[in-house]
Amino acid sequence: MASYESVIGTLEAELTGVADVFRGLAPEQWQRPTLLVPVDPGLPRWTVLELAGHFDISIGLTRMLIAGREDAQPARDRTSFFINPRSETGPVVYAYAYTMVEGKTSADMPGVLAETFTKTIAEARAVPASLVGPGYFAPMRVDEFAASRIVEAVVHGIDLAQALDVPYFATPDGIAMTAAILDDLLARRTTGRRPQELSADMDWILAASGRAESSDNRLPLIG
């Protein structure tokens, strides 16, 4: 398993790529709809602006974990973080993205994200891998939570690329770690391995996250 410093380095590289894309957007691109379908399909899809709001909170949760350091046994890891009913978590996540961007404009968000991403990496580097804090659902070690943020960055980076109709920009290390976590998630939730036709890691990530169609009835694993 990758070292904590390696995990942080991979997360930093992913977040740098995400921040660079957001920083380069024209005003009208912030209003482009994502392809994400809410749990309630009657609701509007996030635009790129709401996706930025989700990035802010999902990555910023790392800082909350560190600030909430506690003497507790970890109850989840980088894989089990993603074992939860979408019907329950999806509406909360959907609504909170709107809360995060309330009162903000597209001109504000690149700076907001840059600050959140920079502080997240700096604070993660300043604490030991074994630190335990609130991991949203349950206590988690910071190294495990940081690894789960790589999945968030890669998968939602795909959402950003799809909304903008640009090539995917995840790093090889980020893709490899995300694919490995999704492999482990498949093993924990069902039986067997990923389909042979999804042997390429990016193809696997797209199908396992529901960002591409798949004939495998075990998929998607995450929403």
Predicted feature locations:
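Structured surface interface patches that mediate subunit assembly and partner/cofactor docking
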Residues: 2-17, 24-44, 64-80, 102-104, ...
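Short amphipathic alpha-helical segments enriched in leucine
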Residues: 19-26, 52, 56
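Conserved alpha-helical segments that form or flank metal/cofactor-binding pockets of metalloenzymes
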Residues: 48-94
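Long amphipathic alpha-helical segments that form oligomerization/scaffold cores
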Residues: 86-111
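Oxyanion-binding "anion nests"
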Residues: 113-117
